[in-house]
Amino acid sequence: MTQEIDEKIPVYRNWHELIRPEKVEIDQSNHSETYGKFICQPLERGFATTIGNSLRRILLSSIQGAAITTVKIEGALHELTSMKDVKEDVSEIILNLKQVRLKLNCEESQTVRIEKQGPGPVVAGDIIPSAFVEIMNEDHILCNLTSDMTFCAELTVEWGKGYQPAENQEKDDLTVGQIPIDAIFTPVKKIQYVVSSARVGQQTDYDKLTYEIETDGSVRPEDALAYSAKILKEQLDIFINFDETAVEPEKKAVETEEKQENPYLDKPVEDLELSVRSANCLKNADINFIGDLVQRTDQEMLKTKNFGRKSLNEIKTLLQDMDLTLGVKLEGWNAPSDAETEE
């Protein structure tokens, strides 16, 4: 149920005044279709652990993938069968089939076949190609044939998430000789995340989240991370009990061109005649011109070392007298050169 909130209460400050990373960086040094290292910073203290652990659980449990769910082997009625001229018994073959990693390029389940003549190993790559099924680990051995017999099997490939025990499958849907298999659907093989400190200006009390993801190749690591974030977002939306647009502050309708025409933008911040404390804070933050200053938000200014609410109010009052405000985007504005400043 949507709750009405008093518009006079600036509840938006709860999320507006938290620092937020602009993007997720990808470490390209070892990046591949199966491995990715991602860096997200800066985050508020404690947020890296919260986000890192939440995404890790979702990555391992909820990202969908494809797996073999049933097998029908010619000459075998059940999983305890031993087959002539096959080194492994059916139970061992089933264990090997569980490790086959696949990519399913359609929504419906698919049936694929193996027809391999011995002697020699039968590998995942011997599965007859299909337009919708792609084998990711083709060298994976399924069994070994000791004669020139032909090994024939029919496999069912389905979508799913997490782990599905064989006994959970509907027995009424199985045909004679069709054996259900424990299915490992998750395409994510390994996840590791590290939380360290991040610096913003002179402050180091922020978090840095470094994520390493390894997949089976059916899903790219960056896509798996994106899907997990989407799942988390969808699950959390239900907790927001107010109209988000109604509580956001009104954006001042100021055209960029009008702002850029303001003559004060090219003036040095010394012209503001600030207090010594405020002036030193701007100098330490490498804010030299008023055009630099107005592009900073309230939140960014308050993160500056030794810069407090009193200094912020002082600056906002002076900018208001110039018909300027903080948090303005100036596209195409560049700080004047030394020669221009002298003129």
From Swiss-Prot:
Residues 1-243 are annotated as: Alpha N-terminal domain (alpha-NTD). Residues 261-343 are annotated as: Alpha C-terminal domain (alpha-CTD). It comes from the Bacteria. GO terms for molecular function: DNA binding; DNA-directed RNA polymerase activity; protein dimerization activity. One of its GO terms (biological process) is DNA-templated transcription. It catalyses: RNA(n) + a ribonucleoside 5'-triphosphate = RNA(n+1) + diphosphate. Its EC number is 2.7.7.6. Keywords: DNA-directed RNA polymerase, Nucleotidyltransferase, Transcription, Transferase. The keyword Transferase applies. One of its GO terms (cellular component) is cytoplasm. InterPro entries: DNA-dir_RNA_pol_insert (IPR011262), DNA-dir_RNA_pol_RpoA/D/Rpb3 (IPR011263), DNA-dir_RpoA (IPR011773), RBP11-like (IPR036603), RNAP_asu_C (IPR011260), RNApol_insert_sf (IPR036643). It holds the Pfam family RNA_pol_A_CTD. Belongs to the RNA polymerase alpha chain family. Homodimer. The RNAP catalytic core consists of 2 alpha, 1 beta, 1 beta' and 1 omega subunit. When a sigma factor is associated with the core the holoenzyme is formed, which can initiate transcription. The N-terminal domain is essential for RNAP assembly and basal transcription, whereas the C-terminal domain is involved in interaction with transcriptional regulators and with upstream promoter elements. DNA-dependent RNA polymerase catalyzes the transcription of DNA into RNA using the four ribonucleoside triphosphates as substrates. This is DNA-directed RNA polymerase subunit alpha. It comes from Desulfotalea psychrophila (strain LSv54 / DSM 12343). The gene is rpoA.
